[in-house]
C-alpha cells in the first residue's frame, strides 16, 4: 500500500513538473500561465483590443498571456506589491492593493476608463494556518470584486482566485449579485493538493 501511495504521489509531481518545463520551454515566467490559458480558452475571456487589469501580477505569466491575447491594440495594467521586470506593452504599478494611494495610482493609469476584463491571482503571505490564510485570501478577493464594481465595464468578466473555506459560499453569492452567472474553475495546472479555486463572474450587471 505504501508503494502505491508513493507511486501516485510521484505521478502527480511528474505531471506538475511538466507544466514547469513547458513554461520554461515556451518562455512563460511561471506555470500559472497555463491556469489562465485553460480558463481563457474554455470561456473565451480575451478579445483583441480589450483593456485588462491584472491584480497580483508577479511574476508576470498572467500578464504575458493577456498581452498575447489582446494584441497590439489592447492594454494590460498590472499591479503587485513585489517588483518585477515589466513586459513590453504592459503598464506596471508596484504597491499594496489594500492601500488607497496605490488604488489611486491604478485609477490614474486607467485614465478614467474602465476595464474589459479583471483578473486577480492575488494571494496573501501564507502562514500555514489554514483559517487565517483562507480569510486573508478572501479579503483580497473581496477587494478585487469591489474594484470591479466601479472599474469594470458592464457586460464584462471577472476572474479571481479564492481558497476553499467557510467564507467561500458567501463570497460566491456576493459575486452573483454583480454578475449574470458565476462559475467555478479548477484548471489542470492547479495542483491537486491546493485549496485554490477560481471563480469566474460572467457579464457584469449594470
From Swiss-Prot:
- Select a single GO molecular function from the record's annotations and give it: rRNA (uridine-2'-O-)-methyltransferase activity
Entry's localization field: Cytoplasm
Asked whether the UniProt record includes Cytoplasm among its keywords, one would answer yes
Decide whether keyword Transferase is in the record: yes
Instruction: Extract the InterPro entries matched here.
Output: RNA_methyltr_RlmE, RNA_MeTrfase_FtsJ_dom, rRNA-MeTfrase_E, SAM-dependent_MTases_sf
Q: Which UniProt keywords apply?
A: Cytoplasm, Methyltransferase, rRNA processing, S-adenosyl-L-methionine, Transferase
* Annotated S-adenosyl-L-methionine binding sites: 60, 62, 80, 96, 121
What does the record give as the reaction this protein catalyses? uridine(2552) in 23S rRNA + S-adenosyl-L-methionine = 2'-O-methyluridine(2552) in 23S rRNA + S-adenosyl-L-homocysteine + H(+)
The protein's predominant localisation is cytoplasm
Tell me which domain of life the UniProt entry assigns to the organism this sequence originates from: Bacteria
GO cellular component terms? cytoplasm
**EC number in record:** 2.1.1.166
One Pfam match, by short name? FtsJ
Annotated active site residues, numbered on this chain, are 161
PANTHER family named in the record: RIBOSOMAL RNA METHYLTRANSFERASE, RRNA METHYLTRANSFERASE 2, MITOCHONDRIAL
Q: Its function?
A: Specifically methylates the uridine in position 2552 of 23S rRNA at the 2'-O position of the ribose in the fully assembled 50S ribosomal subunit.
Q: Which family does it belong to?
A: Belongs to the class I-like SAM-binding methyltransferase superfamily. RNA methyltransferase RlmE family.
Protein name, entry field: Ribosomal RNA large subunit methyltransferase E
Q: What organism is listed for this UniProt entry?
A: Nitrosomonas europaea (strain ATCC 19718 / CIP 103999 / KCTC 2705 / NBRC 14298)
Q: What is the lineage of its organism?
A: Bacteria, Pseudomonadati, Pseudomonadota, Betaproteobacteria, Nitrosomonadales
Gene this protein is translated from: rlmE
Amino acid at each position: 500500500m505504501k508503494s502505491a501511495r508513493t507511486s501516485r504521489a510521484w505521478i502527480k509531481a511528474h505531471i506538475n513538473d511538466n507544466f514547469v518545463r513547458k513554461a520554461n520551454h515556451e518562455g512563460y515566467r511561471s506555470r500559472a500561465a497555463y491556469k489562465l490559458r485553460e480558463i481563457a480558452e474554455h470561456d473565451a475571456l480575451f478579445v483583441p483590443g480589450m483593456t485588462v487589469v491584472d491584480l497580483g501580477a508577479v511574476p508576470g505569466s498572467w500578464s504575458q498571456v493577456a498581452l498575447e491575447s489582446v494584441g497590439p491594440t489592447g492594454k494590460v495594467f498590472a499591479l503587485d506589491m513585489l517588483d518585477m521586470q515589466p513586459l513590453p506593452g504592459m503598464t506596471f504599478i508596484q504597491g499594496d492593493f489594500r492601500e488607497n494611494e496605490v488604488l489611486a495610482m491604478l485609477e490614474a493609469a486607467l485614465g478614467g476608463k474602465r476595464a474589459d476584463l479583471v483578473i486577480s491571482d492575488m494571494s496573501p503571505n501564507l502562514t500555514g494556518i489554514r483559517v487565517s490564510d483562507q480569510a486573508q485570501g478572501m479579503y483580497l478577493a473581496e477587494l478585487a470584486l469591489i474594484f470591479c464594481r466601479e472599474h469594470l465595464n458592464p457586460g464584462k468578466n471577472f476572474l479571481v482566485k479564492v481558497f476553499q473555506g467557510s467564507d467561500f459560499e458567501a463570497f460566491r453569492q456576493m459575486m452573483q449579485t454583480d454578475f449574470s452567472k458565476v462559475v467555478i474553475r479548477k484548471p489542470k495546472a492547479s495542483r491537486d493538493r491546493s485549496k485554490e479555486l477560481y471563480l469566474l463572474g460572467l457579464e457584469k450587471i449594470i
